[in-house]
């Protein structure tokens, strides 16, 4: 189910998305939304104090500038710190992973979801976390805005 499909009437009325009402933000989880996965993921790495973070340069206004990482269609600033630093960025990191590469978190700037790759135990712990809304997906699943076949136009 895609958020823009089930909320289209509200969007057409000119009402802006509002995080204070629980509406999701594209590509940038809030500090509160990052705390729960951080608490789970820290248990599935041996290097929680050594993590890499990539933040999209297009957010603008950021003071967190580091080395640049170039991926197809996206440019990021790279920084390094503890897993708990994921919640402290001016703009939430779009990619982050520990030094031991036990898992990787990815939030595409144009989507409402965050994806995590990790061991079966790690993913199961995320699925079991009451503070998170988590669904299991496979690498073959479409994740673009038009992937919703239930609420299509």
What are these regions (language model features)?
Residues 70-122:
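Amphipathic protein-protein interaction modules
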Residues 107-153:
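Alpha-helical oligomerization segments
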Residues 2, 12-16, 88-105, 141-153:
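N-terminal low-complexity, intrinsically disordered segments
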């Amino acid at each position: 189910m895609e958020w823009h499909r089930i909320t289209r009437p509200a969007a057409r009325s000119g009402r802006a998305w509002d995080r204070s009402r629980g509406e999701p933000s594209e590509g940038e989880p809030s500090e509160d939304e990052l705390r729960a996965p951080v608490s789970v993921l820290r248990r599935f790495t041996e290097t929680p104090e050594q993590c890499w973070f990539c933040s999209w340069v297009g957010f603008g206004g950021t003071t967190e500038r580091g080395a640049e990482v170039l991926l197809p269609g996206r440019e990021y600033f790279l920084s390094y710190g503890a897993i708990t630093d994921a919640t402290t960025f001016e703009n939430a990191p779009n990619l982050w992973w520990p030094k031991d590469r036990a898992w990787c978190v990815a939030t595409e700037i144009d989507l409402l979801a965050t994806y995590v790759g990790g061991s079966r135990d790690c993913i199961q712990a995320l699925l079991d976390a009451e503070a998170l809304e988590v669904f299991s997906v496979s690498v073959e699943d479409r994740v673009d805005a038009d992937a919703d076949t239930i609420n299509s136009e």
